[in-house]
Amino acid sequence: MTGNGADAMKKSRSIRKDNLAGYAFISPFIIGFLCFTVIPMGASLFLSFTSYDLFTAPKWIGLDNFKEMFTGDEKYWQSLKVTFTYVLAGVPLRLGFALFIAVILNNAAKGTAIYRTLFYLPSIIGGSVAVAIMWRNIFGNDGVINALLFFVGIDQKILWYQNPTSALWTLILLSVWQFGSSMLIFLAGLKNIPSSYLEAASVDGANRVQRFFKITLPILTPIIFFNLVMQTISAFMTFTPAYIISKGEGGPLDGTLLYSLYLFQRAFNYFQMGYASAMAWVMLVIVGLITLILFKTSSYWVHYESKEE
C-alpha cells in the first residue's frame, strides 16, 4: 500500500508539472487575449452607455447614444448606406476578378509562380497609406486616368472626387485591386479538383464553359463561401482608403463616408468616445447577423463532397 501511495504521489506531481508547463506556454496568449481583446471590449461596451470625451469621467446616460444614432443622426444612416453600397458592389467584384485570374493562372503552362506572386502583391500593399495616396493622384483632375481619356479623344476632365457616386466607385475599384489573397485560395482549390472529373465531362461532350459551370464552380463553392465571409467582414472594416482619398472628411457630400470613417470622426474629431463605442457595437451586431445569414443560407448553394465519396 505504501509503495502504491508513493507511486500515486509521484504521478500526481508529474501531472501537476506537466500542467504548469502547459499553462506557462499558453500564458502569453491568455494574457494578450485578456489585455488586448476581452478588457478593451468590456470597456467599450461600458462606454457605449456613457457620455465620455477622454478628458472627463464617463457619465452614465443609458441608451441615449443608441437613440441618437437611430433617430437623430442623418450622417449615421448615410454612413450605413455608403458602407453597404461599398460591400455589396466591392465584394462580388473582388471575388469575381480573383476567380477569373485564378482560372487563367491554373491553365497557364509556364510562369505561374511568378504571376501568382505579382498578383498577390496588391493584397499586401493595397490597404497602405502610400497606395491610397497613389490612387488619389491617379484619379485626380490631372491624373493618369484623365490623361488616358484625353489621349482617346475625351477632352472634358472627369472630376472623380467631386461627384459622390464616382468618388465611391474609385474606392470600390481600389478594393477590387486587392484580390490577391482570394485569388491564391481559389487557385489552390482549382489545383485540387480531380482531373478525372473534367476529363469525364469532356468525353461526354461538355465544352469548356459547361465544364466550368457544371463541375468546377460547384466544387469550388466551399472556397467561394469562405472567401465571401472573409471579404465581407474585411470590407465592413475598410478605413484607410476612404480616409486618405477624402482627406478624412468622407466627402464630397458624404459620398465616401464609410462607417469606420464616421466612427473615427466621432471618436477623434469630436471626442465622443461613448457614441463611437456604441457605433462599434452596432457594427459588430450587423456583421455578426450578416455572417449568420451567410452560414444559414450556405446549405442552399454550397456543395461539400460526402465523406463516403
Curated annotation (Swiss-Prot):
Transmembrane segments: 29-49, 84-104, 114-134, 167-187, 217-237, 275-295
One example of a Gene Ontology biological process annotation: transmembrane transport
Keywords from the named record: Cell membrane, Membrane, Transmembrane, Transmembrane helix, Transport
SUPFAM superfamilies: MetI-like (SSF161098)
Disulfide bonds: none
Entry GO CC: plasma membrane
InterPro entries in the cross-refs: ABC_transporter_permease (IPR051393), MetI-like (IPR000515), MetI-like_sf (IPR035906)
Domain ABC transmembrane type-1, chain residue ranges per copy: 80-294
Family: Belongs to the binding-protein-dependent transport system permease family. MalFG subfamily.
Entry function: Part of a binding-protein-dependent transport system. Probably responsible for the translocation of the substrate across the membrane.
Protein name (database record): Probable ABC transporter permease protein YesP
Gene name of this polypeptide: yesP
